[in-house]
Every structure is written in structure tokens, then in C-alpha cells.
Amino acid sequence: MKALFYPTFHQTAARGITQRADPRVGPRHRPAAKRKVVKEMAKKETAPYKIYLTENELPTSWYNLRADMKTKPAPLLHPGTLKPLKFEDMQPIFCDELIKQELDNDTQFIPIPGPVMDFYKMYRPSPLVHAEFLEKLLDTPAKIYYKFEGNNTSGSHKLNSAIAQAYYAKAQGLKGVTTETGAGQWGTALSMACSYFDLDCKVYMVKVSYEQKPFRREVMRTYGANVTPSPSMDTEVGRRINAEHPGTTGSLGCAISEAVEVAVSTPGYRYELGSVLNQVLLHQSVIGLETKAACDKYGIEPDIIIGCAGGGSNLGGLIAPFMGEKLRGEKDYRFIAVEPASCPSFTRGKYVYDFADTGKVCPMAKMYTLGHDFIPSANHAGGLRYHGMSPVLSELYHEGLMEARSYEQTAVFEAAVQFARVEGILPAPESAHAIKGAIDEALKCKETGEEKTIIFGLTGTGYFDLVAYQKYNDGEMSDYIPTDEDLAKGFASIPQVDL
């Protein structure tokens, strides 16, 4: 029976092991020269396939990138007066502590509350993964890493901000919150967070995603959320949008308008947003802080950092500490935002003040926008179907500190399938935009022979997006790129703001 547990000499030799391990041969028994070699090897520890930080290495503060920006994002404007918003102007919509975070351009680090830290430990730190198998498939000299945010029930990075926002709502004594969701990741995350803190949660889900992703809404309902397709007939703005655009599949801008209307008209409720706002990018900085800590721990020096871009929450969080280094003149990186060709806010939008929502009830933001009346085609990357972009990222892009590109969805899904077959994760359609960007950069390295290090954000999993994968696998997926005339209609809705 002993041989079952302790291999004999013949068994170990068969495995290529020609010497038995002697437990007495520890560091004290090694020759000095050998001890030196072992010590040098320890200094150059090779990064594992998956880098997991310990709980003790989890960031204890969020990083506020605005503190290091020489040119701050333009202030939000009151939709009625067109004056910069003050704290009291925002109180009917947002939680008080979140308003403070939204307006704070100076505090570099903001402590993460204890209850939020406790919740983070359920699924954080998340892994930084070396995409070795993708590298081999592409036959590239580039090194590719991805920060995987899909290791929680919500399936994405959205939980990082959802739990923070729910905590502040509970601490303020509120009864519940309202929100919008595109593909459903944010709605799922907020429903989880509200369940944890015993808050009501009303979710307005973009109609096309509500119909495409029935199981995503069931997860939300499982966590106690009330889920309504948007535009609905429950709100004044929803009824108006349905009347003006019969048969519309909706947009994030529509859903935001409905959620805000319900929040401001219901006592004890506030609205919580999953992207775009400064406060959201602040919470999502935990992604970048962990990524940088993992890189520093193993001597990984990225050259290119890539993220998908809809409203900017994942991209802004991933690049935050690296962009901070660039702004302070400490290091240089390339940052690439990847968006859908069907909703090209960065690559074809205008950098102006616009309403953050279709119903014009939200504050106005200076951002890259296609116009608040722009309703994109029914792209399967529902989380990227937003007409605008984060004011923080918009300012950075405007200053030339980051790049942007757009892809058609068939090319994106081709990249998603390539990745899934070698890396073993079915990516969300949104995440697949970043994968496509990373693959293209890696193939450029193959052409030039450069050994660049690429990091991209894998924002979440695509297990609720199987209708989209079915369309792609059956050859029924089509691409749509808005014409100049289509964009002109959206641009026509942009208000004239002279400051």
C-alpha cells in the first residue's frame, strides 16, 4: 500500500526523476555557490499563469484620477439654468456622499468604507491572467495579460461600484434606488448590492436587451429587483419616447431618463448610475490599483492598456493608476479605448456639452457625444450602446493622452470565439471589443518583431449572451455602421451651450 502514496525509485525514474529527494538537504546543507544561485532565482520569481493578490494586498482606498489631471473635466451643468451644478442641485437625484465624490477634483485617495471592503473580499482581488494560449495561437512575440472581472455572480466589474453606491444609500437611510441597465450587468450588480443592504431596487432595462437576455433579468428578479423594459408606459418620459419613436428598441439614454423620473418623484429613493460619472470611475479604480500592484509584484511593465468603452467605467478604472503615472511624468503608456462601430462616441462624436439622457432630465456633461436623441442599432453589446462618454475620459482623449478605435460586431465576435477556444472563458460581447483590440496590437508585434506587453480588461462573461453567439455561429449576425446622415440627426439634438 505504501507505493500508492510514496512513489518508488522506479516509479519516479519513469517520470524522468532520477534522484530521490532527501529531506535533510535544506538550505544549510547546500554548498555556498548553490545557495547563491537559489537566492538569485528567488529574486527573479516568474509570474504565475494567474496572479492573485492576497486579501492583505487589496486596495484600501479608491484612487481619484482627477486629482492628477492638470485640466479637470468640465463641470456638470444644471439642465435648466445651464450653470455648474452645486451640491444642493444634485440632492434630489443622488445620495449625499456620492455627490461629494462626484464634485471632488482634489482628493487623491478616498478610503473604502469597511462594509464595502468586507463585501469586496467575497470576490476580490480578481486575477490578472497571462493569456499564454492566445499568444501561442497568434504566434506573437507580444506578452498579453487580461484583468478578469467576471468572477462574481453579476458576471462583471459593475459590482465594484454597485456595492459602494448601495452602501451610501443605506447609510443615508433611504428605502430604495432606481437605475438603468443595458446588457444587464449593472442591473444585476445593483440588485445584488441592494439585496445585501436590504434596499428596494427598480431597474429600467433597455428593451432590446430585455428581450435578448431573459435569463439576465431573472437573475435580477432573484435578487429582489423590479425589472421593466425601457422605454415603458409607466413614466411620462417613456410614454413620450414611445410616441415619438414607435417600435423603438430603446437606449441607455431612454432608460436613464425613466429611472431618474421615478427616483425624483418617489420619497426615500435616489438614482444610481453604473457608468459615465466621476464617482463610478472612482470606485472602479480598484481594478487598476490591483492590476498595477500585480504588475509591480512580478516586474511586469505594460506598454499598451486596452479597454472597451461604452460610458467608460471599466476603461476608466483599469487605466486610472497608470494614467496617473503618465500625467505625473513618471512613465509612459499607450491607452486604447475600443467601442462599437454602431455607436462610435469617441471616434465620430463631438466634444461638447450634451444631456446625459434622452429625456433631458439629467445634468448636462461635456463629453464626446452622438447627441442625446441618437438611438443606436440593436447591437449585441448592449452595455456599449450609450450616446456619450465619461467626462474624465473625454478630457483625456481630447488632450491626446489616449487613443480610440471602433469595430464592427462580426469582427468582435470572431475575436471572442478565438479567445474562448484557447483561454477557456466565454467573454461578454462588451469585453470582446477589448479582446479584438488586443489581438490586433499583438499581430502588429508579430509583423514588427516587437516584444510589447499588452494588458486588456476582460470585463465579464458572456453566458447570458448566448443569443448573440447563436447569431454569430449561424452566420446570421449583421453589421451596422451609422451613416453621416444618421449621425447628423443625433447631432441636431445637441443644445447650444455658451459658457
Task: Describe the predicted segments one by one.
Residues F148-L159, V177-W186, L277-V280, I306-G311, ...:
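Active-site nucleophile and cofactor-binding loops and adjacent substrate-binding regions
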Residues M1-A14:
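N-terminal chloroplast transit peptides
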Residues A309-G317, Q409-D474:
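Claisen-condensing/thiolase-fold acyl-transfer catalytic domains that form or cleave C-C bonds
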Residues K44-L174:
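Positively charged, low-complexity intrinsically disordered leader regions
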